[in-house]
């Protein structure tokens, strides 16, 4: 699918991202049309998706999106919470039209409806959850692209990208990869340099988890303030007035203290000392004498 071009081959960092997000992990059920995308089956019954096929279908989907002259004619849809943020980010990056949340029936078929639109390409996150837009796309002859798991039905799906469309990280990473490939094929960003947008921006975050993190951060800040207030002593207040010096060259006047004078002695006038070499010899003889008396 990549045409044997090294530029379009899957890089090692892309494989690591897929493995870290769990994109290769499918479900325990398998649709007969998804058998061609399966690599192996684990002992616990979970099917492993072939990431090489995932990358090839990702490039094919990016080529189909780039082929649309007006980016606004591409509709990206996600009715599940895990893909709504990714859909909005993808639309902001590529210029597509997002539909995050509930899809109003008749959007593609009912011309009287205020939300009626006629896109040229449809991209959905889950064929099972987004069955209504897929069904309406079949009525108006609209080509469709879908992120498909091992148990996803491929009815009315023209380009199926095999991946894990249940996990929040996997769905966000797939939309990030698709947006990056679209921008690369359009020439907006270079393949030689990494894209400055991180995949984390496409990940879904539960509002309850965000509130818990904010509360934990606030409690931590309050505890830190209380801890500092208990153990830090107040700074002493200096009320004594400092002497005002108008001219710093003069400085503060220091009273002079007289230095006490001591008499000096002339050492040369003293008599010469006796011979110190004779005294130890005499003492030594006396000690010898005493020793002989004891013996």
UniProtKB/Swiss-Prot annotation:
<feature type="repeat" description="[DE]-W-[ST] 2">
    <location>
        <begin position="247"/>
        <end position="249"/>
    </location>
</feature>
<dbReference type="GO" id="GO:0006412">
    <property type="term" value="P:translation"/>
</dbReference>
<feature type="repeat" description="[DE]-W-[ST] 3">
    <location>
        <begin position="266"/>
        <end position="268"/>
    </location>
</feature>
<feature type="region of interest" description="Laminin-binding">
    <location>
        <begin position="161"/>
        <end position="180"/>
    </location>
</feature>
<keyword id="KW-0963">Cytoplasm</keyword>
<protein>
    <recommendedName>
        <fullName>Small ribosomal subunit protein uS2</fullName>
    </recommendedName>
</protein>
<feature type="modified residue" description="Phosphoserine">
    <location>
        <position position="43"/>
    </location>
</feature>
<feature type="site" description="Cleavage; by ST3; site 1">
    <location>
        <begin position="115"/>
        <end position="116"/>
    </location>
</feature>
<feature type="repeat" description="[DE]-W-[ST] 1">
    <location>
        <begin position="230"/>
        <end position="232"/>
    </location>
</feature>
<feature type="compositionally biased region" description="Polar residues">
    <location>
        <begin position="280"/>
        <end position="295"/>
    </location>
</feature>
<dbReference type="Pfam" id="PF00318">
    <property type="entry name" value="Ribosomal_S2"/>
</dbReference>
<keyword id="KW-1183">Host cell receptor for virus entry</keyword>
<feature type="region of interest" description="Laminin-binding">
    <location>
        <begin position="242"/>
        <end position="295"/>
    </location>
</feature>
<feature type="region of interest" description="Laminin-binding">
    <location>
        <begin position="205"/>
        <end position="229"/>
    </location>
</feature>
<feature type="site" description="Cleavage; by ST3; site 2">
    <location>
        <begin position="133"/>
        <end position="134"/>
    </location>
</feature>
<feature type="modified residue" description="N6-acetyllysine; alternate">
    <location>
        <position position="89"/>
    </location>
</feature>
<comment type="subunit">
    <text>Monomer (37LRP) and homodimer (67LR). Component of the small ribosomal subunit. Mature ribosomes consist of a small (40S) and a large (60S) subunit. The 40S subunit contains about 33 different proteins and 1 molecule of RNA (18S). The 60S subunit contains about 49 different proteins and 3 molecules of RNA (28S, 5.8S and 5S). Interacts with RPS21. Interacts with several laminins including at least LAMB1. Interacts with MDK. The mature dimeric form interacts with PPP1R16B (via its fourth ankyrin repeat). Interacts with PPP1CA only in the presence of PPP1R16B.</text>
</comment>
<feature type="region of interest" description="Disordered">
    <location>
        <begin position="266"/>
        <end position="295"/>
    </location>
</feature>
<dbReference type="InterPro" id="IPR005707">
    <property type="entry name" value="Ribosomal_uS2_euk/arc"/>
</dbReference>
<dbReference type="InterPro" id="IPR027504">
    <property type="entry name" value="Ribosomal_uS2_vert"/>
</dbReference>
<keyword id="KW-0472">Membrane</keyword>
<dbReference type="InterPro" id="IPR027498">
    <property type="entry name" value="Ribosomal_uS2_euk"/>
</dbReference>
<feature type="cross-link" description="Glycyl lysine isopeptide (Lys-Gly) (interchain with G-Cter in SUMO2); alternate">
    <location>
        <position position="89"/>
    </location>
</feature>
<keyword id="KW-0689">Ribosomal protein</keyword>
<keyword id="KW-0007">Acetylation</keyword>
<feature type="region of interest" description="Interaction with PPP1R16B">
    <location>
        <begin position="54"/>
        <end position="113"/>
    </location>
</feature>
<comment type="similarity">
    <text>Belongs to the universal ribosomal protein uS2 family.</text>
</comment>
<dbReference type="InterPro" id="IPR023591">
    <property type="entry name" value="Ribosomal_uS2_flav_dom_sf"/>
</dbReference>
<keyword id="KW-0687">Ribonucleoprotein</keyword>
<dbReference type="Pfam" id="PF16122">
    <property type="entry name" value="40S_SA_C"/>
</dbReference>
<dbReference type="GO" id="GO:0001618">
    <property type="term" value="F:virus receptor activity"/>
</dbReference>
<keyword id="KW-0832">Ubl conjugation</keyword>
<feature type="modified residue" description="N-acetylserine">
    <location>
        <position position="2"/>
    </location>
</feature>
<dbReference type="InterPro" id="IPR001865">
    <property type="entry name" value="Ribosomal_uS2"/>
</dbReference>
<feature type="modified residue" description="N6-acetyllysine">
    <location>
        <position position="52"/>
    </location>
</feature>
<dbReference type="GO" id="GO:0005055">
    <property type="term" value="F:laminin receptor activity"/>
</dbReference>
<keyword id="KW-0677">Repeat</keyword>
<dbReference type="GO" id="GO:0043236">
    <property type="term" value="F:laminin binding"/>
</dbReference>
<keyword id="KW-1017">Isopeptide bond</keyword>
<keyword id="KW-0597">Phosphoprotein</keyword>
<feature type="repeat" description="[DE]-W-[ST] 5">
    <location>
        <begin position="293"/>
        <end position="295"/>
    </location>
</feature>
<dbReference type="GO" id="GO:0022627">
    <property type="term" value="C:cytosolic small ribosomal subunit"/>
</dbReference>
């Amino acid at each position: 699918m990549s045409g044997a071009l090294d530029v379009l081959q899957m890089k090692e960092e892309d494989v690591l991202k897929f493995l870290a997000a769990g994109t290769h992990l499918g479900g325990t059920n398998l649709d007969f049309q998804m058998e061609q995308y399966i690599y192996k089956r684990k002992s616990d019954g979970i099917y492993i998706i072939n990431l090489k096929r995932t990358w090839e279908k990702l490039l094919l989907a990016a080529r189909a999106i780039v082929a649309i002259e007006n980016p606004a004619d591409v509709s990206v849809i996600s009715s599940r919470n895990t893909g709504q943020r990714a859909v909005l980010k993808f639309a902001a990056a590529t210029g597509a039209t997002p539909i995050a949340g509930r899809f109003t029936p008749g959007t593609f078929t009912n011309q009287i409806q205020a939300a009626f639109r006629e896109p040229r390409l449809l991209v959905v996150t889950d064929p099972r959850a987004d069955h209504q837009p897929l069904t309406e796309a079949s009525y108006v002859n609209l080509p469709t692209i879908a992120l498909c798991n091992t148990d996803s039905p491929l009815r009315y799906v023209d380009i199926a990208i095999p991946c894990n469309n249940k996990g929040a990280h996997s769905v966000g990473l797939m939309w990030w990869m698709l947006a990056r490939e679209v921008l690369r094929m359009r020439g907006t960003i270079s393949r030689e340099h990494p894209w400055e947008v991180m995949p984390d921006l496409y990940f879904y975050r539960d509002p309850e988890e965000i509130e818990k993190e904010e509360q934990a951060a606030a409690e931590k800040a309050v505890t830190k303030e209380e801890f500092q207030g208990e153990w830090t002593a107040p700074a002493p207040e200096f009320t004594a007035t400092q002497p005002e010096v108008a001219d710093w060259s003069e400085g503060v006047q220091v009273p002079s203290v007289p230095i006490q004078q001591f008499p000096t002695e002339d050492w040369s006038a003293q008599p010469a000392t006796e011979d110190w070499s004779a005294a130890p010899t005499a003492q030594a003889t006396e000690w010898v004498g005493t020793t002989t008396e004891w013996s």
